């Protein structure tokens, strides 16, 4: 799949769901994986010619596992001239040592998002973009149907009033197989 087609799919999702408004400050939630880096790269390209002006940032939550190193993410952000924020936490200690929750992934995700949303508020950033792709939406809907008996997937846009942040998912039309193309054709 060509990069132009993928950028077109991202732009289409943004327009279909009014994900970007004039003057938005948008942070891409970056894990260091291909999906989030591809989204950051695509948003940087779109930022140059999109008709609505917006500021772009990248944010990572370091949950505190030993050996985690986000130097590569920081360098990538520098190379495309996107301000980068790393939120350092002790979430791993809380989840795995202090709490020993039976569902550590769920608790970790909640704490990680909470830490990022808090920092976004401090920085005056009003939106966070996650790199959930088309396959993620389909898998989530099917798992919800199988395990919960209901058909549910992530909403494309979600306002979180307690955090004052809007979550957007611009890659919702991009198939998994096309994600790497955004990085490797640049």
Predicted features along the sequence, with ranges:
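Short, flexible loop segments at boundaries between secondary-structure elements
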Residues: 153-174
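ATP-dependent adenylation/nucleotidyltransferase module used to activate substrates
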Residues: 1-142, 147-150, 155, 177-178
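Conserved small/polar residues in nucleotide/adenosyl-binding loops
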Residues: 184-185
